[in-house]
Amino acid sequence: MRPMMQFVFLAALALLLPTASIAQKNSSPAGAEQASLPHDSHSGITVSAKPLTDSSRAKHIFGKANPIPAGVLPVEVVLRNDTNAPVQIGLDTIQLEIHYQSGRMDGVDSLTPAQAASVIAHPNGPAAPRERRFPIGMAPIGDKKANKFLETLRPLALNSDIVPPMGTIHGYLFFDLRHDMSLVSQSSLYIPDAMVIPSKKPLIFFEVSFADR
């Protein structure tokens, strides 16, 4: 029964992977450009990443949802899999690690697209609660400004956690640096969780340094 279940899993995965690959592969950097990006590579997996600190460039990409004026750093990430097995990346555990000259280190968690949109819409923090205008039990009106920005950010974000065999995925991660972009030059992108599926074989962490970039 176990071999049959594994076959069914692989068959289902084969149907899903092309969609994930196509969704984020079209806009990925060309091979030569990708090779020039800061990267870490082992076990047949290459993680390339580039922090975007130029506000005018960010505005060209994100439009009115430009994260930089709100103190949020967008990081372009390309994940390439040169093996014959799919690899799963733990998106929820990715951090931007800040390495201070004193030796202290801080980890900044990545924001979801919804969290990033909220910070961009309200860079000074959420508005103070207002008096309820609707009867209890009725759904409140959503944050229209944040939702509008989310429509821009979501398709650009790194939202697939599966890197298909011999495939590439590409997108942006967002980190709230509270307007201190000087931290970028002493930071690195840290990806602690990656594994080969369906064997669930863990891979050593990936770390891409942005020092002096």
Residue ranges and their predicted role:
Residues Q24-R213:
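Conserved functional micro-motifs across diverse proteins
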Residues F7-P18:
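Bacterial N-terminal signal peptides
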Residues M1-F7:
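Positively charged n-region of N-terminal signal peptides that target proteins for export
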Residues T19-A23:
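Sec/Tat signal peptide C-region and signal peptidase I cleavage site
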